[in-house]
A protein has these predicted regions:
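Extracytoplasmic/secreted proteins, especially bacterial periplasmic and envelope-associated proteins
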Residues: 55, 65, 69, 73, ...
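N-terminal lobe/hinge region of extracytoplasmic solute-binding protein
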Residues: 30-82, 119, 126
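Solvent-exposed coil/turn segments that connect beta secondary-structure elements
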Residues: 32-35, 43, 65-66, 83-85, ...
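Bacterial N-terminal signal peptides that target proteins for export
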Residues: 1-9
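Bacterial N-terminal signal peptides
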Residues: 10-17
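Sec/Tat signal peptide C-region and signal peptidase I cleavage site
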Residues: 19-24
Length: 181
């Protein structure tokens, strides 16, 4: 056997060994760069959104794959008031939090979680607003969410209402963005 044939056989054997399936509980993610973090809200890099917002988090509404059409996410339905100032979302029931060795969820996802998610970005007094020193919420601020959202209110455990200061045509698209995770 010549050297070229041996090299090809060795390379083939290595390639076959690499094709062995990874254990079922192992998550393998390849990216062109390192994400800034795994919380998409305070960051702006596509690598962060690709590594966290899309595979890990859900939003009230999401974009239908390959489009800018909004479809249900954590909210199964919603109503918009005639004046465009109130958006009422009806949350899916039975949504479970992920669990792992250090976190065991004690309840299902509910309206309080939606309120927390938006409050931590828009309310500087929220203890989780700057849980990493110096972080900002550039997309949230650029979409003028702090001045747009008057309040996020719990109607009941599975219903949340956003009250806006003014009508905002792209509001539904804005909350489908990765930063709204």
């Amino acid at each position: 056997m010549n050297i070229l044939t041996r090299s090809l056989l060795a390379a083939s054997a290595l390639a076959l060994g690499a094709a062995v399936p990874v254990a079922a509980k192992t998550f393998v993610y390849c990216s062109e760069a390192s994400p800034e973090g795994f919380d998409p809200a305070p960051y702006t890099a596509g690598t962060t959104f690709d590594a966290s917002a899309h595979p890990v988090y859900n939003r009230l509404v999401e974009f239908k794959k390959g489009t800018t059409e909004v479809e249900p996410g954590l909210a199964e339905s919603w109503e918009v008031s005639e004046d465009g100032l109130e958006y009422t979302f009806h949350l899916r029931k039975g949504v479970k939090w992920q669990s792992n060795d250090v976190f065991t969820p004690t309840r299902d996802f509910n309206a309080d979680d939606v309120i927390f998610s938006y409050d931590r970005q828009g309310n500087k007094d929220n203890p989780w607003h700057e849980y990493i020193a110096g972080i900002t919420y550039e997309y949230y601020t650029a979409m003028e969410m702090p001045s747009l959202i008057k309040s996020v209110e719990k109607v009941d455990d599975n219903t949340v209402k956003f009250v806006l200061n003014r009508p905002e045509a792209p509001f539904m698209a804005n909350i489908a963005m990765p930063v709204a995770s």
